[in-house]
């Protein structure tokens, strides 16, 4: 429907209505139903719902509070710390791409992270063969879509839909990416091959994810299984790392008798309600 918005103004109005209706029903009205007598909202975290191992949140889902749109930011403002406290937000930057670099051993991707470069601009520079400082916003956006898409085993068709380009051009982006980072291609191929042989993948911490789809008699189901095999070790390891971080942060806060406390986990991000006098510690 989004593709029709430019040609038919009413479509844009319908999409805007849907967005506002979602914000109102799910957040403006929905969250108010979960406020307890203390004025707080408590979510429920689940360890075993997602296949990747990530924590999920329900009743209400506090991992999905909108942030990108201006109205979403206003909704976030209803959450505030206790008097004298403040929120400290810490996250693992580009954790899945960093894990891809580590697990594949691709020197170029590793070097880009070691130099603390804008990873999407770095990829665009290499894939499109232009100097780093001359990468355009469009080239960076395309490289970003490829960077994240590769982790999820994106197809040329899927990338073409994301970027609104032809399938042939999208395939060219993917081919150029693998020419730039050959060890990533090798890693993904080997990961899928091992998963087909064993029927499962492992995270770096040894957690197993069975992938029965790889032995399906249905071609589309097998393709889905291959995409799962590519992504599961990366996203699963990221999930393991953030859980370990949660334990370590909690234990240190207790051990050092801090008043600060861990109050929320949003995938690769931790939110701590921090006492003003403890914020530098």
Regions found by a protein language model. Give the residues of each.
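Conserved catalytic core of nucleotide polymerization and phosphodiester-bond processing enzymes
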Residues: 1-281
